C-alpha cells in the first residue's frame, strides 16, 4: 500500500463517534470530530507553544537548525500519521498523542528532568508523563468551565499508557514501577476518571510511541552530524545504517557530506516506518482484533518493530549514547543545566515569595503546607522554557553558567 494512501477505517482503530467522552460533558462540534478537537486544543495551548524554547539535546542558543521539543513533536506527528494512515487508524487521535507527548518535559531536556526528580526524590520524584497529564487536565487555564483542556478519555489514556500498562488487574505496579510505584498524580486522576491502568493503550497511542523512537533515532543522527559530533562514515559501525550508507554511495558516488547525511536520515525513517508497519500488520493478522477494546485487552503490544529491526534500532541508540548524549561537549552543558534547575528549586523552597505573583497561593506562601508548596514549585519549574529558566536564575543568583 502506498504510504500516502489512507486505508479504510479499521474496526480495531478508535472511532471518535464512540469515544468514552470527556471528564466534563460538552456538546459535540458540528464540523470537527472529538479527536480533531483534542488535537486543536493541544496546538492552541500555552504548553505546546513553550516547546519552541525547550531543549531536545542542544540548548536553545547553540544554533537555529537544531531540534527543539516543538520541532521534534511535529516530526513525531508526521511519522505517526504516516503509519496510522497505512493501518487504517484515526489520524487525528494519533496526531494529538504525538503532539502532546512531550508537554510535561521541564527545561533542558532529560537534564532538567533528572534534576527535578532528584529534588523531589523524598516526595515521589518527578515523572514527565505524569506532568503531561497535569498540564492537560489542570495546568492549562483557557476555559471558563474547567481547568485543563478537557480532552477525551482516549487521548488521556494514550498519554499515560503509550508505553504499555502501568499495573496488573489488581492494581499492583508492573516491574518498571516496582521500586517507586506508579506516579501518584496518575493514580489519583485515574481514580476520578478511570484510565484502566492495567490495560494496553489504543493502537493510535502505540503508533505515537514508536514514532517517537523513530524520530529520536533519525533526527538525533541529523543533529549530531550537524554539530560535528560524528561523521556519516562513523555510522558504518551500525549494520543497518552501514547498508543505507553503502546504497547511497552506489547511487550518488559524488554526494557531499551534508547531502549524504540528509539522505541517510530520510532513508532510515522510511525503512523504520516500513518495518513497523509490516510487523504490526502481521501481528494484527494473527490476533484479529475486532475492536479497539480487544486491542487494549491483548496480552502484548501490537505495534512493534520486527525482531531484527528492534535489534538494529537498539544499536543506533547505543551509538548515539556513546557519540552524542555522552559527548563531553553535551555532558558539560547538561551538568550546568541540572545545577540551574536544582538551584531554582531550592531557592523557591527557601524563599517561596520569589515565585511570580500569579504562582503564589491566594492566602500567601506562609499559609501553604509543604506538600502544596512543593507541587506548586514543581509545576512552575516544569513549565519553564530553557530561556526563562536562565533568566530566572540570573535574576535570583549572582552567577549563572553560560550554556554554550
UniProtKB/Swiss-Prot annotation:
Keywords: Hydrolase. Residues 69-217 form the HD domain. Residues 1-33 are annotated as: Disordered. One of its GO terms (molecular function) is dGTPase activity. InterPro entries: dGTPase (IPR006261), dGTPase-like (IPR050135), dNTPase_2 (IPR023023), HD/PDEase_dom (IPR003607), HD_domain (IPR006674), PHydrolase_assoc_dom (IPR026875). SUPFAM superfamilies: HD-domain/PDEase-like (SSF109604). This is Deoxyguanosinetriphosphate triphosphohydrolase-like protein. It comes from Rhodopseudomonas palustris (strain BisB5). The lineage of its organism: Bacteria, Pseudomonadati, Pseudomonadota, Alphaproteobacteria, Hyphomicrobiales.
Amino acid at each position: 500500500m502506498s504510504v500516502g494512501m489512507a486505508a479504510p477505517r479499521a474496526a480495531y482503530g478508535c472511532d471518535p463517534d464512540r469515544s468514552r467522552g470527556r471528564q466534563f460533558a460538552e456538546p459535540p462540534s458540528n464540523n470537527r470530530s472529538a479527536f480533531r478537537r483534542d488535537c486543536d486544543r493541544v496546538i492552541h495551548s500555552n504548553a505546546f507553544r513553550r516547546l519552541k524554547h525547550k531543549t531536545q539535546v542542544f540548548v536553545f542558543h547553540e544554533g537555529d537548525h537544531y531540534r527543539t521539543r516543538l520541532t521534534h513533536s511535529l516530526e513525531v506527528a508526521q511519522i505517526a500519521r504516516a503509519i496510522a494512515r497505512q493501518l487504517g487508524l484515526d489520524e487525528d487521535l494519533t496526531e494529538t498523542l504525538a503532539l502532546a507527548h512531550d508537554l510535561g518535559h521541564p527545561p533542558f531536556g532529560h537534564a532538567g528532568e533528572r534534576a527535578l526528580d532528584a529534588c523531589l526524590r523524598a516526595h515521589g520524584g518527578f515523572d514527565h508523563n505524569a506532568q503531561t497529564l497535569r498540564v492537560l487536565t489542570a495546568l492549562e487555564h483557557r476555559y471558563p468551565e474547567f481547568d485543563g483542556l478537557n480532552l477525551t478519555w482516549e487521548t488521556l489514556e494514550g498519554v499515560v499508557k503509550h508505553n504499555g500498562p502501568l499495573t496488573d488487574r489488581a492494581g499492583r505496579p508492573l516491574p518498571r514501577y516496582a521500586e517507586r510505584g506508579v506516579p501518584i498524580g496518575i493514580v489519583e486522576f485515574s481514580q476520578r476518571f478511570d484510565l484502566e491502568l492495567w490495560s494496553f493503550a489504543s493502537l493510535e497511542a502505540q503508533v505515537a510511541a514508536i514514532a517517537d523512537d523513530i524520530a529520536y533515532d533519525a533526527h538525533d543522527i541529523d543533529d549530531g552530524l550537524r554539530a560535528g559530533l560524528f561523521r556519516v562514515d562513523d555510522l558504518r559501525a551500525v549494520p543497518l545504517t552501514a547498508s543505507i550508507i553503502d546504497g547511497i554511495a552506489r547511487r550518488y558516488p559524488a554526494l557531499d557530506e551534508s547531502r549524504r547525511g540528509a539522505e541517510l536520515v530520510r532513508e532510515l525513517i522510511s525503512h523504520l516506518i516500513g518495518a513497523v508497519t509490516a510487523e504490526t500488520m502481521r501481528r494484527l493478522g494473527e490476533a484479529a482484533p475486532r475492536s479497539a477494546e480487544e486491542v487494549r485487552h491483548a496480552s502484548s503490544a501490537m505495534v512493534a518493530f520486527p525482531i531484527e529491526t528492534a535489534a538494529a534500532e537498539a544499536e543506533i541508540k547505543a551509538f548515539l549514547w556513546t557519540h552524542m548524549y555522552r559527548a563531553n561537549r553535551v555532558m558539560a552543558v547538561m551538568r550546568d543545566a541540572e545545577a540551574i534547575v536544582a538551584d531554582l528549586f531550592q531557592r523557591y523552597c527557601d524563599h517561596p515569595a520569589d515565585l511570580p505573583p500569579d504562582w503564589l497561593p491566594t492566602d500567601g506562601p506562609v499559609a501553604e503546607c509543604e506538600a502544596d508548596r512543593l507541587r506548586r514549585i514543581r509545576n512552575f519549574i516544569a513549565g519553564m522554557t530553557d530561556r526563562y529558566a536562565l533568566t530566572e536564575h540570573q535574576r535570583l543568583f549572582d552567577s549563572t553558567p553560560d550554556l554554550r
